[in-house]
């Protein structure tokens, strides 16, 4: 197995209640990208209006001191990925995002840049979903049909962004998020699922993974009871799961 050079910042949500776009994690983004990165390649495929989405992301990253290029503005998306200093994939609909990644032949290109070349990768919400083994545990509606649910596989487990605890006062009779993840684990040979509540994110550096942010994460392992974990918890053992 090749040595992983991955540097990932996998964020549950782009906007935290009461704050601005990426405001809750901007200090971590600055530390993550550092001074060596000058420009970030943004992948806006998860939303329909890519121009407006790129404008929002560009304003934020320029305020942080980085230039931003959007892959949809490039005549050759694969070449744009090959030249990227850092990659940021934003949130939206995960099915739409993954289909566009396949349609533009970016799966292998992104994997090579991140896992072999060590290019920093930031994912938010849907961008975090596609960084995992598959999008089986996304919360989104399948509004389009990608050729596969298999994703970038930058980590060997799945993540459920925006993880939501059951509301004991609600009269809603639909399944809880925990019940849906449990259903997923009723299927044979399904990987761990890390439920990231809004306000937390996972930092992956090589073979080390650490929970950051202000909220806890809930870990689901097939055949076991879910467990709660505070910010600062070491999730490196998940990187050895296959």
UniProtKB/Swiss-Prot annotation:
EC number: 3.4.13.21
Record: active site: 125 (charge relay system), 140 (charge relay system), 162 (charge relay system)
Compartment list: Cytoplasm
GO cellular component, one term: cytoplasm
InterPro entries membership: Class_I_gatase-like (IPR029062), Peptidase_S51 (IPR005320)
Reaction it catalyzes: Dipeptidase E catalyzes the hydrolysis of dipeptides Asp-|-Xaa. It does not act on peptides with N-terminal Glu, Asn or Gln, nor does it cleave isoaspartyl peptides
Enzyme class: hydrolase
Keywords annotated in UniProt: Cytoplasm, Dipeptidase, Hydrolase, Protease, Serine protease
Any one of the GO BP annotations: proteolysis
Coiled coil ranges: none
Record's keyword annotation contains Hydrolase: yes
GO terms of molecular function: dipeptidase activity; serine-type peptidase activity
PANTHER family: ALPHA-ASPARTYL DIPEPTIDASE, PROTEASE S51 ALPHA-ASPARTYL DIPEPTIDASE
Family recorded in the similarity comment: Belongs to the peptidase S51 family.
Function in brief: Hydrolyzes dipeptides containing N-terminal aspartate residues.
Protein's recorded name: Alpha-aspartyl dipeptidase
Organism of provenance: Xenopus laevis
């Amino acid at each position: 197995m090749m040595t992983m050079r991955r540097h990932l910042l996998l964020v549950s949500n782009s906007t935290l209640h009461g704050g601005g776009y990426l405001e809750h994690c901007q200090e971590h983004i600055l530390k993550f990208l550092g001074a060596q990165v000058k420009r970030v390649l943004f992948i806006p495929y998860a939303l329909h209006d890519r121009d407006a989405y790129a404008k929002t992301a560009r304003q934020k990253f320029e305020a942080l001191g980085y230039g931003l290029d959007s892959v949809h503005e490039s005549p050759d998306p694969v070449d744009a990925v090959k030249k990227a200093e850092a990659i940021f994939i934003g949130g939206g609909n995960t099915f739409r995002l993954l289909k566009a990644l396949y349609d533009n032949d970016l799966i292998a290109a992104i994997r090579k840049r991140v896992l072999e070349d060590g290019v920093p990768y930031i994912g938010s919400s849907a961008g975090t979903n596609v960084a995992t083994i598959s999008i089986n545990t996304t919360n989104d509606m399948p509004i389009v049909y990608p050729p596969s649910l298999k994703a970038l596989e930058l980590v060997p487990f799945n993540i459920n962004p925006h993880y939501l605890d059951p509301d004991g006062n609600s009269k809603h009779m639909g399944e809880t998020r925990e019940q849906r993840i449990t259903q997923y684990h009723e299927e044979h040979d399904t990987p761990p699922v890390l439920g990231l509540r809004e306000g937390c994110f996972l930092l992956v550096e090589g073979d080390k993974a650490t929970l950051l942010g202000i909220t806890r994460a809930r870990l689901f392992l097939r055949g076991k009871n879910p467990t709660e974990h505070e910010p600062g918890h070491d999730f490196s053992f998940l990187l050895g799961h296959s």
